[in-house]
Regions:
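N-terminal small/polar loop signature for handling phosphorylated ligands or for N-terminal nucleophile
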Residues: 9-76, 168
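Glycine-rich, mobile lid/loop segments that gate access to catalytic sites or pores
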Residues: 1-4, 133
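Short Gly/Thr/Asp-enriched flexible loops that form oxyanion-binding sites at enzyme active sites
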Residues: 9-13, 72-93, 138
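Well-ordered alpha-helical segments embedded in enzymatic catalytic cores
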Residues: 47-51, 92, 96, 162
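Phosphate-binding and adjacent anionic-ligand microenvironments
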Residues: 57, 61-63, 67, 83-85, ...
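Generic detector of well-ordered alpha-helical packing
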Residues: 1, 69-73, 183
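Short, acidic/turn-prone active-site loops that include or flank metal/cofactor-
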Residues: 25-29, 90-93, 157-161
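Gly/Ser/Thr-rich active-site loops/lids in small-molecule metabolic enzymes
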Residues: 20-23, 83-102, 200-204
Length: 398
């Protein structure tokens, strides 16, 4: 996308003899003005990928890959029944991980002896690393297949400086990494690279496409198959623009001191200091039992160094007083993280809810869009309760 990636993607595709490859001529060369798009960020989706999709339609190609200008991220979309499906970073990670894990650890009769994909690796231990605001799918699939003793799943703070460091540490232990990723379309698919790389990721997904399409399937069909098997990992990640940055710390402090206990320096922080429930009922002393799905069962606050998920209440991830970040757990299948951006005047939130794979066949939802719509409504209700956007002049970036 008006950057450095096209030359290298074309080169590696030629080496792998992928002949059905065409690039958008108007966007193939570096252009610091990004003349053909309003925003070269591939996360924007349809608008940014429009020219590539139009070219694919003319050529009758079903898949589009797009790198951002510095080619460290990869976006992907697929034409399904005449419409383009834009995959999120979480969905792409699910597809790639499941394909690798199921190839390594499953047979037609179920879980079997691992079949190593990497001929040059003697490691018996594999790793998956992901940022703490990305999907929990790696944990889900490893628990489902009972391979946690062979595949270690680890969270890091946001940023590939943390993910890359973990990949290097694993390599020094003689262990392989299956994938390191962030929800924002950042992927590290090789032990030979210690940062997100859209070029090697593009090759990896192209090779996977070759395998999937050879089986007369599609990325979207495979994703649906995974969700029906392992559960629908629905996510809603958005942000509020902050007009007055001086309000950020008081807003986050209000959440962590919800009970107005006025902790002193020698006081012991506990789960009771935070909201007991999420949503518009968060301030109610006796929420209705029907809202138990929003009952907070755990909190991790990396700003003050608190994590109720451990007996000592100490987080295992690094803490920083300069980074505002709180995560709420409502059971094991509902997670919300709120954090202040370190580079922009934004308060970001990341919500994930895991639902059974039968939600469409049992009539719970009529469509995937309706399920996401309900999640969106839940997210906005929760944010209204915690952040009071109108009162605090927070502008929704969605």
């Amino acid at each position: 996308m008006h950057g450095c990636g096209e030359l290298f993607v074309r080169r590696i595709f030629a080496q792998r003899q992928f002949s059905l490859f065409e690039s958008v001529g108007e966007q193939a060369e570096p252009d610091e003005l990004f003349r053909t798009v309003r925003d070269p960020n591939p996360e924007v989706g349809a608008e940014t990928l429009k020219m590539a999709c139009e070219l694919a339609e003319r050529l009758e190609y079903p898949i589009v890959f797009v790198n951002d200008p510095d080619a460290d991220r990869l976006a992907m979309c697929e034409r399904i029944e005449g419409k383009w499906k834009f995959f999120t970073g979480n969905e792409m990670a699910m597809i790639y991980l499941a394909a690798r894990i199921e190839t390594m650890f499953t047979t037609s009769s179920g879980v079997g002896d691992p079949k190593c994909l990497d001929d040059d690796s003697n490691s018996n231990i594999s790793n998956i690393f992901y940022s703490t605001v990305s999907t929990m799918f790696p944990k889900t699939i490893c628990q489902f297949l009972n391979i946690e003793h062979r595949v270690k799943v680890s969270e890091t703070l946001t940023g590939f400086k943390y993910l890359g460091e973990k990949v290097l540490e694993a390599q020094l232990r003689g262990e392989r990494t299956l994938l390191a990723f962030e929800e924002s379309l950042g992927f590290l698919v090789s032990d030979h690279v210690y940062d997100k790389d859209g070029v090697s990721a593009c090759l990896a997904f192209a090779e996977l496409a070759n395998t999937i399409y050879t089986r007369a399937s599609t990325f979207n069909a495979y994703l649906t198959q995974l969700q029906e098997k392992y559960g629908y990992h629905l996510t809603f990640n958005k942000y509020y623009k902050v007009q007055d940055m001086s309000k950020v710390i008081p807003l986050m402090d209000r959440i962590r001191d919800w009970r107005n206990r006025e902790l002193s320096n020698d006081s012991t922080r506990s789960l009771e200091d935070y909201p007991a429930y999420l949503g518009s009922i968060s301030s109610s002393p006796s929420p209705p039992s029907s809202d138990d799905q929003y009952k907070v069962t755990g909190v991790r606050d990396l700003t003050v160094g608190f994590d109720s998920n451990y007996e000592d209440n100490k987080p295992r991830l690094p803490i920083s007083e300069n980074n505002q970040m709180i995560t709420f757990y409502c059971g094991s299948k509902f997670v919300l993280t709120i954090r202040a951006s370190g580079t922009e005047p934004k308060l970001k939130f990341y919500l994930e809810k895991v639902l059974p794979g039968t939600i469409f066949t049992d009539g719970t939802f009529a469509s995937y869009e309706s399920a996401i719509g309900v999640l969106r409504d839940e997210a906005l209700d929760i944010m209204d309760g915690l952040l009071e956007p109108k009162k605090n002049q927070l502008l929704p970036g969605f």
